[in-house]
Swiss-Prot record:
GO biological process: 'de novo' pyrimidine nucleobase biosynthetic process; 'de novo' UMP biosynthetic process; amino acid metabolic process
Gene name in the database record: pyrB
The protein's name in its UniProt record: Aspartate carbamoyltransferase catalytic subunit
Gene source species: Bacillus subtilis (strain 168)
Keyword entries, A-Z: Phosphoprotein, Pyrimidine biosynthesis, Transferase
Pathway listed: Pyrimidine metabolism; UMP biosynthesis via de novo pathway; (S)-dihydroorotate from bicarbonate: step 2/3
Length: 304
């Protein structure tokens, strides 16, 4: 049984194994070792990509899937998250995927339950499977992380994606740049350097946009003029390196953090990220339940 709650708990070797397993699954290799097992997806925050991606991953592995949202569980009646997970464990659930608005909701939970917990996003904290699918997408493009410059733009302070990605990319040998409004800078995230949007775009191999996390701000945030000040405009995109790519964890607010015409442009890998998410989550579930597809020769060589 292996939980996955943060990227920092994964060694470089484990990351390599997950990426390689995901790539093999993407090529069609699977042995359905998990057929008949039960997965519960428990989401206390709205989700489209992560929720359905996990469900597709589970079904591709032959699992039975239980989907629950926070409003339909007894948590609404005062039940603790611990008791909810213990209930699922007692009725035969084998793995639980959780998205929660509370940072580090899993901190005590993982030592108290007997089924693996997979973190599908905790507040402003971490989003490990998003980070892994981003790594897979970047590696497919460049066959390395070492020496790359990856810039992350926008609401850094409230972004669990920025937090997960900055740490692991730095560990794998990439240089991380941040840009965005000064009030949204994250002083606790020391894995990147803040520069102007223009400087970051021109020097990056990967330009990663973030949406404004409106649900985590205490007051409404004006979107007027945001694109020209802090977003990826057509004019800025024209100054990107020839080989550089555009990424976004989605949901995308077209015309806010990225010009509408760039979302599905030649440089964009946004929908490829979503596709890769299914295979990464299949690999993560296999790891959680300690099963793996049979590997051939090592395909991923990660320098650090």
């Amino acid at each position: 049984m292996k939980h996955l709650t943060t990227m920092s708990e994964l060694s470089t070797e484990e990351i390599k194994d997950l990426l390689q397993t995901a790539q093999e699954l993407k090529s069609g290799k699977t042995d359905n070792q998990l057929t008949g097992k039960f997965a519960a997806n428990l989401f206390f925050e709205p989700s489209t990509r992560t929720r359905f991606s996990f469900e597709v991953a589970e079904k591709k592995l032959g699992m039975n899937v239980l989907n629950l949202d926070g409003t339909s569980t007894s948590v609404q009646k005062g039940e603790t998250l611990y008791d909810t997970i213990r209930t699922l464990e007692s009725i035969g659930v084998d793995v639980c995927v959780i998205r929660h608005s509370e940072d580090e909701y899993y901190e005590e939970l993982v030592s108290q339950v007997n089924i693996p917990i997979l973190n599908a996003g905790d507040g402003c904290g971490q989003h490990p499977t998003q980070s892994l699918l981003d790594l897979m997408t970047i590696y497919e493009e460049f066959n390395t992380f070492k020496g790359l410059t990856v810039s992350i733009h926008g609401d850094i302070k409230h972004s669990r994606v920025a937090r997960s990605n900055a740490e692991v990319l730095t560990r794998l040998g990439a240089r991380v740049l941040f840009s965005g409004p000064s009030e949204w800078q994250d002083e606790e995230n020391t894995f990147g350097t803040y520069v102007s949007m223009d400087e970051a775009v021109e020097s990056s191999d990967v330009v990663m946009l973030l949406r404004i996390q409106n649900e985590r701000h205490q007051s409404a945030v004006s979107q007027e003029g945001y694109l020209n000040k802090y977003g990826l405009t057509v004019e800025r995109a024209e100054r990107m390196k020839r080989h550089a790519i555009i990424m976004h964890p989605a949901p995308v607010n077209r015309g806010v953090e990225i010009d509408d015409s760039l979302v599905e442009s030649e440089k964009s890998r946004i929908f490829k990220q979503m596709k890769n998410g299914v295979f990464i989550r299949m690999a993560v579930i296999q790891r959680a339940l300690q099963t793996n597809v049979k590997r051939g020769e090592a395909a991923y060589v990660i320098s650090h």
